[in-house]
Design a protein with these regions (language model features):
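Charge-dense, helix-prone N-terminal extensions
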Residues: 2-212
Length: 212
């Protein structure tokens, strides 16, 4: 099937929306966040995966942002994973139901906290004990990371004025690299340097929304 025909068929289903099979993948293209939510509402318990389409800026097409797509997925117990390419103007991201026992990343925990406050999490998902735990369990700041920040007087002064959510996200990002010592040191140094200058780090995929 040609790329032109693929996109034509995908666009023709926007109003419902319905997924199409493209090169063996179940692909979904939505113009608006509410369409993605509607699809999840009808399929989150029955489907096992979908490849969501993100148009490039150069395409001139309207699509759902990565962050909005992830938020809606979390509302229905799904998470994002592998990235792919549909064509030169359209990227793909695989969304699947979250595996039981799979840990939530700190950005996703922050998303869940906000979504819970807004009452957007599906009742069946909100009733899950793992979701409850993710939302309500206090974050533990590793003492060695705090000690490293305290060692820089100006950085520590500025650090204390940052929001709790920002500190959780950035410290968790540093901590996640512990098994890669060089990367861990790089992340910690970058955070301390930025904090000394009283600058926040802009994260991936719109995570700064949660730097409340």
């Amino acid at each position: 099937m040609s790329e032109e025909k693929i996109m034509s068929e995908l666009h023709s289903t926007i109003s419902l929306p319905e997924a199409q099979t493209v090169n063996g993948k179940t692909v979904l293209y939505c113009h608006e966040r509410r369409e993605w939510r509607a699809w999840l509402e009808g399929h989150f318990e029955s489907e096992r995966e979908v490849w969501f389409v993100f148009p490039s800026v150069a395409s001139g097409e309207v699509g759902v942002s990565y962050n909005d797509a992830v938020e809606e997925a979390l509302c229905f117990g799904w998470i994002d994973g592998q990235a792919g390419t549909l064509d030169e103007m359209h990227q793909l991201r695989r969304f699947t139901p979250r595996r039981k026992g799979s840990p939530y990343s700190q950005p996703n925990i922050e998303r869940l906290i906000l979504l819970d406050k807004e009452g957007l999490i599906h009742p069946k998902v909100r009733a899950n004990s793992e979701v409850e735990k993710a939302i309500t369990t206090p974050f533990t700041f590793p003492e060695d990371i705090l000690t490293a920040i305290r060692a820089d007087e100006k950085a520590w002064e500025n650090y204390q004025n940052f929001s709790d959510s920002y500190k959780r996200i950035r410290v968790a990002y540093i901590d996640a690299a512990r098994k890669r010592p060089e990367e861990y040191k790089k992340r910690l140094k970058n955070f301390i340097d930025k904090t000394r200058d009283n600058k926040r780090i802009m994260g991936y995929g719109g995570v700064e929304k949660y730097y409340l």
